[in-house]
Amino acid sequence: MSCLLHPNSGNLPLPLCLLAFGEKGLALAFPYFVIVSVSQNTFGYAMIAGNLKWKEFFFHPIVISVTAAFIVKITDLTVPNMLLNTTSYLGYTAIPLPLLLLGYALPQISAGNIKIGIVYALARLVFGGISGLCVIYVLGLTGMLAGVVMIMASMPVALLNFIIAAERNVEPNNIGGIVIVSSLAMVVLIPLLVWFVLWAFPV
């Protein structure tokens, strides 16, 4: 279920929103990214692992980070440049780590895992596109905001689902297959998605 509900909301859709709509589009995409990230790292974790303790919820790095950012924002605190640079470099260093983990697991993914991956990947992409259109229709969104929602909702299965599955040993090969297939499908679908968004939701 987490694979269907939690798409890739960071390293793929954010650059796409920047490409399609510029800095304003990227700014609109960030709140969506934060909400999905918090949900994925807490409720998504519980869906895959089967449980989530309240202590794990409140002390999860993403929850602490969002809370700290919110406090800084509302209080207008000035964060020292040294701290900003340190956290930025640590963040850049962490980007390839999930990809290395998935690459390590690739030899263990069988044809059966890929078949399951195809089914769930198609379900995620269809579910994401339809849910995005429903949100746009229900909320009456137009223009850039509608386009950003459509891009964010139509993304493939997030790699984090595989990381959680590998950590808790809950069908990691099946979930790895889902992540791989849905991500490869987006290589073909991204140009079509960007074209559709710019055509359907002109700024």
Where are these regions (language model features)?
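Alpha-helical transmembrane segments of multi-pass small-molecule/ion transporters
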Residues: 1-203
